[in-house]
């Protein structure tokens, strides 16, 4: 029972990260989550933005062959 709830939690986290990863770059720039040269990469926000852009690159490269 505990494993099922933990797996549900992991799946929901993956779905949330995936939903942010498919967002358009213009939308992310409007809300201040675009990649900027003055972004502090050691902050929590900087790490999340880097993760989102890495996921977007990964999913685009993975599905570009289809």
Curated annotation (Swiss-Prot):
Signal peptide: none annotated. Keywords: ER-Golgi transport, Membrane, Protein transport, Transmembrane, Transmembrane helix, Transport. The chain crosses the membrane at residues 7-23. GO terms for biological process: endoplasmic reticulum to Golgi vesicle-mediated transport; protein transport. It is found in: Membrane. It is a single-pass membrane protein. Pfam families: Yos1. GO terms for cellular component: COPII-coated ER to Golgi transport vesicle; endoplasmic reticulum membrane; Golgi membrane. InterPro entries: Yos1 (IPR013880). Its main location: membrane. PANTHER family: IMMEDIATE EARLY RESPONSE 3-INTERACTING PROTEIN 1. Belongs to the YOS1 family. May be involved in protein transport between endoplasmic reticulum and Golgi apparatus. This is Protein transport protein yos1. It comes from Dictyostelium discoideum (Social amoeba).
């Amino acid at each position: 029972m505990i494993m099922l709830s933990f797996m549900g939690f992991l799946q929901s986290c993956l779905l949330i990260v995936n939903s942010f990863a498919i967002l358009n770059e213009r939308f992310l720039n409007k809300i201040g989550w675009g990649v900027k040269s003055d972004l502090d990469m050691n902050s929590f926000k900087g790490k999340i933005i880097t993760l989102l852009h890495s996921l977007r690159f990964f999913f685009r490269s993975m599905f570009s062959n289809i």
